[in-house]
Amino acid sequence: MIKTILIDDEPLACDLVAEYLQDFPQLQVVSRCHDRFQGMKAIQEHQPDLIFLDVQMLKISGFELLELLEDPPAIIFTTAFDEYALKAFE
């Protein structure tokens, strides 16, 4: 089982990703977080294998949150904005 955390400040977007992930039984969503504080707490608590991380959130970007992690797990960036897609590959 792959422990997965969803971090997105838009609850509907978080729900949509969770719905898509239901087609992948090997992924277990252990937490849905809607801000950086919930996200950091969930990461420390669950030690996930994978994080779906929104690029643009209030007060902090997904890129900035990633920099706060000492030993980050695999990250899949999510965004509704084309301009962030290229930066996510860097």
State where each predicted segment sits:
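Non-catalytic signal-transmission and effector/linker regions of two-component phosphorelay proteins
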Residues: 1-3
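CheY-like receiver
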Residues: 40-90
